[in-house]
Amino acid sequence: TRGFLGLTVSCARCHDHKYDPIPTADYYALYGVLRSSHEPLLPPLYEPPADTEEYRAFATGMAEREKQLDDYIREKHAALVEDARSRIAAYLMAAYGRRNQPPTDDFMLLTDTDDINPTMVLRYQVYLEEHQQQDDPVWSAWHRYAAIPDQQFEQRAPAVWQSMFGPGGTPPAQLNRLVHASLSSGPPDSMQQVAEAYAGVLKQVESRWQEIVAGQQGADPASRDLLDEDQRELHLELHGPRAAASVPLVFGWGLLALFPDRGTQEELKKRMKEVETWSVKTAGAPPRAMTLEENEVPFQARVFLRGNPHRLGEDVPPRFLHLLPGEPIELAGQGSRLQLARAIATAKNPLTARVIVNRIWTQYFGKGLVTTPSDFGLRSDPPSHPDLLDFLADRLFAEGPRRGSLKSIHRIILTSATYQQASLDRLKCEQRDPENRLLWKMNRLRLEYEPLRDSLLAVTGQLDLSIGGPPVNQLTDSWNGRRSLYGFIDRMDPAPLLTTFDVPNPVASSAQRSETTVTPQALYLMNHPFTREVAARTLARPELQAAEGPADRVALLFQLILGRLPAAGELQLALDYLGDATNDSRWLHYVQMLLMTNEFAFRD
């Protein structure tokens, strides 16, 4: 939302936004849309592949490997669900042991094959916490016993039993008849005994259901009519869409969390690696799109009360933000990411176009018409030129062949008299508008790391302008002329050089880069092997080698590096320094000096 809408919706995770009209429900409505997607094990095809013999051979091998992986996952998933429905007492006790802890995966470790599944423990824990109502027909008795401190269970359990099942007691309203029968014979000695009572009655219903399935050769949901009302109620505790055991099967990388035992993890990773390697390195493998896929069953979002994931509130259907004026922008169907993207990009949305053109303006002028590119809320500064912002936004979404064309916005800005101004100071203007908010001159902007590196490569004549291809490690390779756009970045451990030049942390969104002036930046340009190599390769250019004399060579260096001819004084200083040097050391130092000038590193 910050990137396209200029809104900090994340502030509404725990409570309604304190400044902007964004309720908590809007945050979780968007969360539900995004949570309904997963990262697939194998990215989808970028486009339909050509039907070649090479591709057909690839597809045959791919189908075999995908089927082996699919069969293995389905087998393990079925075993996991069966385990959750057969070891009910063990999972209930594990969830009981974590009842005062938030349901997070911090405790998840690799387990042995026969251990209970940590993911399923979490699901049982969340499920029980969702059914804490005093009138819950199945679990109300469980929660009355679970509220007794462990050390006092033997002393206080009889009183709890008496209040529900003894003479004069009042059972929880609408308590399931079968649960009542399993618990009413006498007070339990421990929570383990309560868990076993629940497990026993649930297994009885499960056994009855399996008899129906076997007798009808695969019963459909309508066959639940063969169970009585109390049996159907308990059947849903194991088979309902929100039941703890009804863990959805999603073929994404999240599968690893479902199977934490060592053997399954190793085998699953092995098979996944085989599919991935075949899809990337085999001849005939088509390009794939790095994107998410929609879940078959959309995620039903619920409000986290005060942002606490184990205190769930009301259900929230997927929808777009309701703060925008005019008719609400609805998400059609089940609220997919595609519908969300359309709601963001529609011309009915007054924010998107303004946020986009403001970001473009920021890149050209160093400061946006709105100075906070990612915050158009009530706390942001008003635009310096609101009419101009509206004009550019209208042009972006104007009807016609260039509707939505970013190139048209670039063209408008670049051909304007405002952009084509020099960055020369004027005393009267500076006194009236020292921050240049009225744009009486062009702002002088320092090159960021990527354009600075590309400019250094361009001076050598060896900048590689090819488009596409794999990333390259530009920080360790001895020499690589590829544009900095294709540089590899370790998201978890960014290189110190990048942070030195204010490249933001790639893990988090950054509205605008900071600009620092520190000693390591100058030392890099002075001493780093890359910049010395740039100077050497610049001097080795054929046109410089063919220059008739030092004066012509200096003039050509000025043209290559600074885009102009040297002034008479600059030329004389250069000739005085270089003298009649026949070796390249002075020339190397001179080229490095030009590369270190502000004129090279700044855009006027």
Range-by-range predicted roles:
Residues 1, 21, 222-481, 498, ...:
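Primarily short, surface-exposed interaction patches in extracytoplasmic proteins
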Residues 1-60, 64, 494, 498, ...:
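Sequence context surrounding c-type heme c attachment/ligation sites in exported
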Residues 41-185, 193-247, 251-367, 481-498:
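Short, functional "switch" segments adjacent to catalytic/cofactor/reactive centers
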Residues 519:
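Active-site-proximal helix/loop microenvironment
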